[in-house]
């Protein structure tokens, strides 16, 4: 059967009677029809099959009818359409029977589906032609549109209605406010003709314009409305204006040229008083001060309250001729900011009378931003800021910000003596090369550092972030700290560009490591440092700092920049500070260093490390040229972590045995990290009855180390006695890590007699690696002091609590001098009676002394270069005067001493502890944790404090405990002894605040007193008298070693527990 019609839907209109409506197209199933009804309001309802209507003729070829369950209302329309499921249900099988009707039905359905799609397409909003540029709605409504949002969107009726309503309302509102006349009126004259006039009407009622009467309200209003009208308004900052008035608003911004200040702007008249008055006014009004001109001032401008100062542009600022000791601008209060413009000094570096400073930040939370600060100088060496030091910016405050400033042509750029501040994005230079003075810097120079951390003399700078600045062409160094004393600690120096400075780039150096002089725990990362004259990064005596990922280099520009004034081109140096303050505990990792090739004018080094460096990590640095690092001795590899391979030569020696003299012997050692690669050869020159073991030393760098592993072997041996032909020499570490012991292996047995087989032409060569334990800071404790330290109970308790060895150099009755000498911090000069040190035995020394070595002193020493022991002889029992007696350890030649010779104590323990006996040599004590308790027997407390500073400088680390001194039971409150002792302890606390033995404000002595027995009257009395409780003492002074009657604790344990707790709180041990 064919599909002979294109009709796929029928539409009818109801008459209120008819229920049957034909459909004139074929359907397969009655569900193929969709029946919809449209009511008079154009609402469309889809009817439900077998509920609202039934279908006849489905599946046939003659069409059928849709029969409604009720007549279609008059005027309602009904739509009958065919909608087939889009499926293909005919299944043809391979070699199956052919049924024509089946195929026709399938083809018919496809045709019907096409008709269905075509019908739906006819319902769409379409263009009438492919070439048309519009859509034709064919007279139909388009509904459910959104209101327009873009210019070319279609407008809905609702949108147009609302817009029209709003326009009409607005027009009505405007019209209601117009001046209207009942008849037609002429237009007003042109703008040119009506300018500055008022409207009026002539005798005919026509509009005209006239000039107002002078002084009338209309005239005033017209004048005020002119562009120049604001100049006719009177205003003064001395007046009070009501809220909301123009005057009240104008008072929020103050110009120094305003009334009543009238600051002069001619450049010569003094504006100091006017500016200070304006500042004071702004402080009281919470107003902004706007610097609108260049002003000349003759004295300091002081800001004491929160205030914002803004310069209108870079030509606005102040030129200061403030006298010596008076900074140009002083921030004496908190929350002060100065933004933009300039602050300028007289720019006279050669004047010996003009000593100027720029901006002084005494307050906190202040900001100095985008200001040009220049021209502040003070001639020559200067160690006090009382009369001006030539500093551009000096910061004494907390959390102050110095940002985006140009700090130029000053003696010092920025001096930091505060904490937790920010120095960000500044340019700092005194343009030394442009000056007539340009030469290698010395202390007579008028051009010094870009930044000086810790001030010019004994200041403190902590917690600063110094980031993103440029330091160029300063007379001394770009960033300098420590060399003037003071503290520079816990600061971050990052992302700075530091170049062309006449001394160094980053220059940190400890003058002497004291409680008030140290450089530590700074972070120096990601800086670009290049072509500074003396060194790029110089760290002298610096400790516990991080120096990572910096770029340091020299280029050929260096030669032209500093022609005739060259220094060593060193990229990065760990150097000694003053008084041999060692660089310790630093991390120097991932830096890129490139220097110039050394020639007859320049010595180029990528990295230098001093021989006192301890506990530093130097790894993963990129060095170019590779061989230009300077590491002076292999011992540095044993006490640091250095991954730069360096070769050292040495001459092997025979140790022990006899009868063999070495001839042409040599050794080569390559150190890298904790691995020492060894190659050595020995050759016998003469042999006479050889005997003993073959021990070879001394391998440099390995003394005192612990060997983790070695593979040293005999690579070659020749011309040994023929009886050795079947024996194989093999190598082991000797009594010390710096010695090699060579055995012979014969018949499976190890024989320690290889030396006996040497002949006059015997040769032996050894190669291999020795791996040592990596260096770590010692956890051992060295005790120096008087009888409080010679307590078995205390040392045993310290060992138990800290889990480490206790080396005890103390002696009961030791003076402060003896204590310092036992730590090898000081030496003394003596003369032997008779003028010489005898070949053997003892000799008395002069002079005799009081308070240096009390009677009973003894120990190991060296005098005039001779090892021995010393003792004392009491000369005067009344004064305690003693005389030293020196006894040689072994006989030798007599030594003549014309005047005096040096006397020094040797580092031997003098008191047994539970782990280390007396008489043990301990040369590495400088790496230990120190407990120092040595002032009680001093005749001069001031001398003791001074000696403590010397002892601290002698330490390799800053891990030490200073113990307060305890009173005798007679030194009650108010006595001279009590007063002097309290003064000593206060001085110890003041000079060594980080190392004085106190926890949370409670010191060792206060803690000891707090352990008294409140139920024991004797203890209560002692505490009231300011002395230690008797229940914790074993006599009139010393802490108890056993539990005393009425005691709650053992005194020595109380002290040991507190000292151990202090050490643990520092993270040093336990």
Swiss-Prot record:
- Kindly list the GO molecular function terms attached to this UniProt entry: hydrolase activity, hydrolyzing O-glycosyl compounds
Q: Kindly list the biological process annotations in GO that this record carries.
A: adhesion receptor-mediated virion attachment to host cell; symbiont entry into host; symbiont entry into host cell via disruption of host cell envelope; symbiont entry into host cell via disruption of host cell envelope lipopolysaccharide; virion attachment to host cell
**In its keyword annotation, does this UniProt entry include Membrane?**
no
Superkingdom field: Viruses
What compartments host this protein?
Virion
Which of UniProt's keywords are assigned here?
Degradation of host cell envelope components during virus entry, Degradation of host lipopolysaccharides during virus entry, Glycosidase, Host-virus interaction, Hydrolase, Late protein, Viral attachment to host adhesion receptor, Viral attachment to host cell, Viral tail fiber protein, Viral tail protein, Virion, Virus entry into host cell
Cite a GO CC annotation. virus tail, fiber
The EC number on file is 3.2.1.-
Summarize the protein's role: Structural component of the short non-contractile tail. The tail comprises six spikes that mediate primary attachment to the host cell lipopolysaccharides (LPS) and display endorhamnosidase enzymatic activity, hydrolyzing the linkage between rhamnose and galactose of the O-antigen polysaccharide. Digestion of the LPS brings the capsid near the cell outer membrane.
What's the name of the protein?
Tail spike protein
**From which source organism is this entry?**
Salmonella phage epsilon15
